[in-house]
Curated annotation (Swiss-Prot):
Gene3D superfamilies: 3.30.300.20, Ribosomal protein S3, C-terminal domain (3.30.1140.32). GO terms for cellular component: cytosolic small ribosomal subunit. Keywords: Ribonucleoprotein, Ribosomal protein, RNA-binding, rRNA-binding. This is Small ribosomal subunit protein uS3. The lineage of its organism: Bacteria, Pseudomonadati, Aquificota, Aquificia, Aquificales. CDD domains: KH-II_30S_S3.
Length: 231
């Protein structure tokens, strides 16, 4: 069977960036990584209705910069910033003795954010909307918002069937093996009374690097040199 590489990991250093940016010793690495996982899980569970797409974390010494990308930033910020201040205090209690700075940015076009699209489809399926209707609605909204291509897959015991299967729709182009292609990817889980359904979404927004192979290799080399200097 043909296996697919992760579209985000495949493009890191070319058109995509890391969600966590920090360097640490081998001894501290597990604890630091676990802190990142706890921070992301806490924020996502606390603001389930805020439409959180990504949580990026940067570390410098004892300072942690957390950036939240959300389709509804007002829920996280709160009235006069009261909610975001409370979140900052709660996170500082979790990580212990570290200074946290928070920033909340808006996802301008949620119809083109693969993670938000996947979570919206999962929510509709949990509310007993037909999976095909939810998939086609997401595809129509993405194409109308300017996507060059979109692929949506639902996998599991669809409709309570005895055997698990996968259904997918593809509209437009999806050049998964082209490094310069700006492809966003998201995954969500729908919990139904028959079991768990997995939803995957790929959205192609066009090319970021207009040049050919030479320009892409030059960009990779420049990134490697800059990373070596930082270390």
């Amino acid at each position: 069977m043909g296996q697919k590489t992760h579209p985000i990991g495949f493009r890191i250093g070319v058109t995509k960036d890391w969600l966590s940016k920090w360097c640490t010793s081998k001894k501290e690495y597990p604890n630091t990584l676990h802190e990142d996982i706890v921070i992301r899980k806490y924020i996502k569970e606390r603001y389930k209705s805020a439409g959180i797409s990504k949580v990026t974390i940067e570390r410098s010494g004892e300072k942690i910069r957390v950036r939240i990308l959300s389709s509804k930033p007002g829920i996280i910020i709160g009235r006069k910033g009261a909610e975001v201040d409370q979140l900052k205090n709660d996170l500082e209690r979790i990580v212990k003795n570290k200074d946290i700075s928070l920033s909340v940015d808006e996802v301008r076009v949620p119809q083109l954010d693969a993670q938000l699209v996947a979570e919206d489809i999962a929510l509709q399926i949990e509310r007993r909307v037909s999976h095909r209707r939810a998939m086609k609605r997401a595809i129509d909204n993405a194409i109308k918002s300017g996507a060059k291509g979109i692929k949506v897959q639902v996998k599991g015991r669809i409709g309570g069937a005895d055997l698990a299967r996968a259904e997918w729709f593809l509209v437009g182009r999806m050049p998964l093996q082209t490094l310069r292609a700006d492809i966003d990817y998201g995954y969500a889980t729908a919990y139904t009374k028959y079991g768990i359904l997995g939803i995957k979404v790929w959205i192609y927004k066009g090319d970021i690097l207009k040049g050919g192979k030479e320009e892409i290799m030059k960009k990779i080399e420049e990134d490697l040199v800059s990373q070596a200097k930082e270390v």
